[in-house]
Amino acid sequence: MANIQGGQQIGTNQGKGQSAADKLALFLKVFGGEVLTAFARTSVTMPRHMLRSIASGKSAQFPVIGRTKAAYLKPGENLDDKRKDIKHTEKVIHIDGLLTADVLIYDIEDAMNHYDVRAEYTAQLGESLAMAADGAVLAELAGLVNLPDGSNENIEGLGKPTVLTLVKPTTGSLTDPVELGKAIIAQLTIARASLTKNYVPAADRTFYTTPDNYSAILAALMPNAANYQALLDPERGTIRNVMGFEVVEVPHLTAGGAGDTREDAPADQKHAFPATSSTTVKVALDNVVGLFQHRSAVGTVKLKDLALERARRANYQADQIIAKYAMGHGGLRPEAAGAIVLPKGVGVIPDPTGVTLSQKTMTLVEGASRALTGTVQPSDANQSLSWSSSAEDVAVWEAGKVVAKGVGTADITATTSNGLIASCKVIVNAATS
């Protein structure tokens, strides 16, 4: 049979003077668009801080100018005697290097595969770059707040960063989402005033926090949702604005930037979020509730914007697709940055370390029931338990009790939020007449 003639080659660039060697040339632009879309969708800091592009060089300078004061001039006095110089300094942000993410798609695997993986690969490339950029910006924001007293102002008198500690409620606990949300809102009230005292503009203020704390703020506002229609959308569970801050939930709040390896704990991480709080480290992973800022607090310098490159790896019979950018991140204005932290001694809710049941064995007759409760250790851990039965036709757990359904043996198992289990063996005998 003769070879088939014709057939569309949609990916080949067949324009006049163009090379047709690359069969995927026209597909590349779609792929690149998907990377850009994924980056824009995932990044939460890019539209909320200072961005500056440079054509060449290894760094960018941001001038800082201080303030002066006015004074009355009496007859006969000389302005030279009253003049006060306006102080100057600068902040410099250096390019971190070339950040990359790539995939290698082998021809044979691509041919045998029955579903499209490129769309998901593109999303992962874009999201990895976005999370690295976000992590770096947020780590720099935390770094501003942690500046030592000797350097926590660009120029003396311009203002210092603000660190606010949640106040424990007189009744209830910060482990209660509603109480936690109320406490965060109370500190955002103080944060608003702190920035304004530093002459930080009222617009473009942002509060970054974790999904747990974001949900806590929602829980605190929800009972009065009718009165807060301008602040939140109860139907979608989103917050628009609290105390002049755009509230943004960030799952990767404390992840930090990229490193020299692509492991979960990268080597030589360039912008690491502080791990442990101390007398000198006010904000760290173990106590941060959220970071607040004006968009001028942190800056990013772009040498090479997000771009895509595809290379044919003939020796591997594969296509390599690379997403990359060259940027640098750094703090600019300490007076426009701040953080809310947990009180000393109050930390992240610990994971359960064990679970025990009120009974290890139980004997019932058909139709009877008996209480069975579980206790999670430690007491301040997540106390939620999920219950299951190995034989639901014999016995089940319902509303704190084991209910006997039929003759036989069943194991009633309680499982903690992190997968620890405890079981009670239940024997069900026939009911006597």
From Swiss-Prot:
It is found in: Virion. One of its GO terms (cellular component) is viral capsid. The keyword Membrane does not apply. It comes from the Viruses. Residues 353-419 form the BIG2 domain. It holds the Pfam family Gp10A-like. InterPro entries: Big_2, Capsid_Gp10A/Gp10B-like_dom, Capsid_Gp10A/Gp10B_dom, Invasin/intimin_cell_adhesion. The keyword Zinc does not apply. One of its GO terms (biological process) is viral translational frameshifting. Keywords: Capsid protein, Virion. Gene3D superfamilies: 2.60.40.1080. Belongs to the T7virus minor capsid protein family. Assembles with the major capsid protein to form an icosahedral capsid with a T=7 symmetry, about 60 nm in diameter, and consisting of 415 capsid proteins. The major and minor capsid proteins are incorporated into the capsid in about a 90/10 ratio respectively. Once the capsid is formed, encapsidates one single copy of the viral genome. The minor capsid protein is produced by a -1 ribosomal frameshift near the C-terminus of the ORF coding for the major capsid protein, producing a protein with a C-terminal extension compared to the major capsid protein. The major capsid protein is produced by conventional translation of the same ORF. Interacts with the connector protein and the major capsid protein. This is Minor capsid protein.
